[in-house]
Amino acid sequence: MVDLETKNRILKAGEELFSLKGYDATSIQEICEKAEVSKGAFFHYFPTKESFFLEILDLWLKDLTSRINEYVKNAQNIYDSLLKMTELFKEIFKESRPKFLLFIEFLRAGIRDENILKKLSEYFELYTNYFAQIIAEGIQKGIIKPVDPKVTAHVIVSYAIGTIEQEIFKPDNQMEEISREGIKLILESIKKED
């Protein structure tokens, strides 16, 4: 039987420690101490440190995907759905610096670990395809100029990742506004003239 409270406590402790110390510098023992569980409890839920890290990554990216879907669902049309996602930047920037550091830690760990890189690549491909589909639909409906949907989606995803990284290296209140204005600039460049 899975005790969700215990499992969530372990996940929260790991997320905090990974964002503070990094993947390599965080031990399973430290995670267990912070979560106030035994190593046996840890291994009951997660067979390895890597599988634990991947579950944190998966939960984080599923939450992000859910929020993106919510913005798209509540928009009036394809172009507005993309534009409305600028509000997501505001939410992301309010989530705090530890989330940004955790994101960078996922990227860093992915460089050295093939399984983590594979999981990151799957999500980046998912997001790219998702945005490409929205853009293709916008082109078909005459809302967006005839651009290459896949290339445009890559630009949007790359911009989002770059903006998150900039917030880590230059944390100030301006990044939220710069992010929204930047995505608007990208979207205005593909909007079909009336």
What is the role of each PLM region?
Residues 58-63:
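Short, basic, alpha-helical segments at the C-terminal edge of helix-turn-helix-like DNA-binding modules
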Residues 55, 69-97, 152-156, 176-180:
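Hydrophobic alpha-helical connector segments
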Residues 93-117, 168-169:
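Amphipathic alpha-helical segments used for helix-helix packing
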Residues 1-5, 194:
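N-terminal intrinsically disordered/low-complexity leader segments
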Residues 85-91, 129-137, 159, 165, ...:
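C-terminal peripheral helix-coil segments that are non-catalytic and often amphipathic
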Residues 9, 13, 17-51, 55:
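Helix-turn-helix
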